[in-house]
């Protein structure tokens, strides 16, 4: 919000999550698809005020596990499968569906593909307004990923083979060169969850990659900061945060990306719970991104899976998806990959067991597809306003109905990271634990991303009351709809957030 002494401030409220079947028609809808009576309970519409700041930037929604050329079609017990080669028409249909669901970047498939497949899907990505990330390729008998990671073993020495810069650039050209000028070519999916001992290698490859493909993305996704220290590549506990800061210092990419899947089943109670370090990972990676102004990207949970003794549950409701995305938006995130999109095998090479996500193991859309579609449509509907702001900090508010007196996710944050007050907010109260992400645009307007942080499995609504200093009106984006509303005389706005829901207030 801009700071005015004698005039009002226009506020923009943006609820970022659509529901299945929402078509943007007038009327506000709750998680059941019915009108929400609290949407304009204490305000009336006006055409006198507005917030008009906008950008052309697009929120990035990426697939993880893309469309294959040969799809494994499993039997009902998932004990066997046959291979189905997808026709050009079937490939076209899948890309059309991904585009319609709001995906902006398609990743490569689970298993390696050849260049012929990527020629087809690059054209399809362009046709439907998307970008295509290329995955593993083997050309002239040499794996691109293995070469770039230093994993090819010299048969004569038994040690990793060494390649000159020119040899690496030549293989990059051989594998990806024909795609470099394609309008849909996004980059190369390089390394998932490396430890810090690999950073020098990644830095070298990024430099060479940019010499061959300037401006394209060499994609690296990092581990949760809370995993075992040895997995991060350090031995001293005091060095844990260096996993992120060393990446920023050594590797010149325009983003930092990580994963932390938050929804799990408690082994003792059987209850669906939230990982207490979900927000802490956001904090650490947000702080790293802010060192030099990088994009903050993450992976979120669309597929239930069982691995390393933890059962990550399948998101069941629209609230599960809204809650994940809205929490990330409260920390100023700008890109999300869904883990997973097209179904991986039932069990992977290290024993992790997978359910399915937006597509099942017969290649059919699931209910998850429609929930993700709804969420992504709503984010795209207000992204031009959201990206007009820069993230500054976050407030954590304990809800009035919190009976234990603390929220594990909030207490996990470093002391002093979350702020307690903001000059624009005179008073606030929340029924449930609530996040308030604080933003500011180039003209001095303040923005707030307010999220119902209650466990979506508990299905609790969050009655939020905010009193703003020096403000008379709000412009509201909710479910692909914009309304401009007058505040109460004292600057108060009241709203009931559905489970997992969020609003953006300018």
Tell me what each language-model feature is.
Residues 33-473, 477-506:
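Glycan-processing catalytic domains of CAZymes
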Residues 1-11:
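Bacterial N-terminal signal peptides that target proteins for export
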Residues 23-26:
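Bacterial signal peptide processing site
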